């Protein structure tokens, strides 16, 4: 899968990234790099990572997602994983995936609602 297929869209102060259905390791690495570059370039306050099309999760993908969540947090942003399928949730749990302070939402609309309504850690 070509890394050029990764879409990172800035909407107001947030980034929306839709993960391809079956990303290989190269695509997952490129996704992380593009997210971090966009966070730095735009100074965004949050990331919505739409994983609704993802059907399987391997250990590299799980680890990279967890690392990306942590890196976004270190850059001052918050992350919401949107649209996680039940099978992916089961696999993530079996792999011991911890998301730190990332939030989860059933879909992208709810993810944006969470980021727009939740207070930032700076104000807590």
Q: What are the roles of these predicted feature ranges?
A:
Residues 1-10, 120-124:
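Non-catalytic signal-transmission and effector/linker regions of two-component phosphorelay proteins
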Residues 109-124:
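A cross-taxonomic marker for long C-terminal extensions/tails that follow the last structured domain
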Residues 35:
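Anionic-ligand binding region
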Residues 100-111:
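Short acidic-hydrophobic, aromatic-tinged amphipathic segments that line or gate anion-handling sites
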Residues 4-32:
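STAS-typified acidic loop motif
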């Amino acid at each position: 899968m070509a890394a050029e297929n990764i879409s990172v869209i800035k909407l107001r102060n947030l980034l929306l990234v839709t993960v391809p259905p079956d990303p290989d390791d190269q695509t997952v690495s490129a996704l992380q790099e593009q997210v971090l570059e966009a966070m730095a370039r735009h100074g965004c306050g949050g990331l919505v990572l739409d994983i609704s099309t993802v059907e399987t999760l391997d250990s590299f993908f799980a680890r990279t997602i967890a690392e990306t969540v942590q890196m976004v947090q270190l850059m001052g942003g918050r992350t919401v994983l949107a649209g996680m399928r039940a099978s992916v949730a089961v696999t993530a749990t079996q792999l011991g995936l911890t998301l730190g302070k990332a939030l989860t939402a059933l879909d992208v609309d709810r993810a944006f609602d969470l980021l727009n309504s939740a207070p930032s850690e700076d104000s807590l």
